[in-house]
């Protein structure tokens, strides 16, 4: 009826099927229950994007003179005195253009839009207290960094109207693509 070889093959196939079924049924780990479902209020609080044209900038104001002390208190430990180097990298100064072997990618030589300074600072600085700066403080720090890079004067006020008007030295240094955003993703 069954040969030894056929019987062994059949038993092996049944065992493999049972083992595979056991692994699939009982071996799968449950999905970890991490986080929570984002509420509309959560999403609204995260919607802090600033666009190059200034869309999304909050009300507030600041000057480089106001930002200097704040920089010394909040930023110099990582970015050095006056933003010229440190473990967090230089934000100002630099003598090597972007086409050199070791280019300086500081704000004045690399960043194409002044509004990006505000956006990045508000989201990601200071590193030990993200999101802790008020809009006025971020405007003051932005003004100070622009001043340190020779782009504005010490008393020039940065706000939602003046900041997008700053023409950064490397504004035309990137290859741009036209992107059409779906209506649902355009800022309100």
Range-by-range predicted roles:
Residues 11-21:
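Bacterial N-terminal signal peptides
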Residues 21-27:
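Sec/Tat signal peptide C-region and signal peptidase I cleavage site
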């Amino acid at each position: 009826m069954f040969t030894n070889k056929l019987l062994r093959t059949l038993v092996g196939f049944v065992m493999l099927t049972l083992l595979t079924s056991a692994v699939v049924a009982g071996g799968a780990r449950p999905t970890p229950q991490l986080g929570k479902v984002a509420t509309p209020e959560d999403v609204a609080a995260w919607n802090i994007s600033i666009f190059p044209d200034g869309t999304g900038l909050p009300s507030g104001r600041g000057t480089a003179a106001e930002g200097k002390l704040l920089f010394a208190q909040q930023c110099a430990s990582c970015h050095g005195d006056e933003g010229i180097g440190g473990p967090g990298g230089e934000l100002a100064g630099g003598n090597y253009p972007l086409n050199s072997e070791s280019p300086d990618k500081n704000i004045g030589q690399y960043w194409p839009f002044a509004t990006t300074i505000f956006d990045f600072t508000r989201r990601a600085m200071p590193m030990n207290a993200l999101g802790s700066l008020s809009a006025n403080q971020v405007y003051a720090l932005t003004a100070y960094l622009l001043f340190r890079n020779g782009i504005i004067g010490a008393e020039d006020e940065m706000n939602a109207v003046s900041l997008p008007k700053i023409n950064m030295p490397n504004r035309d240094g990137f290859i741009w693509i036209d992107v059409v955003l779906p209506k649902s993703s355009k800022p309100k």
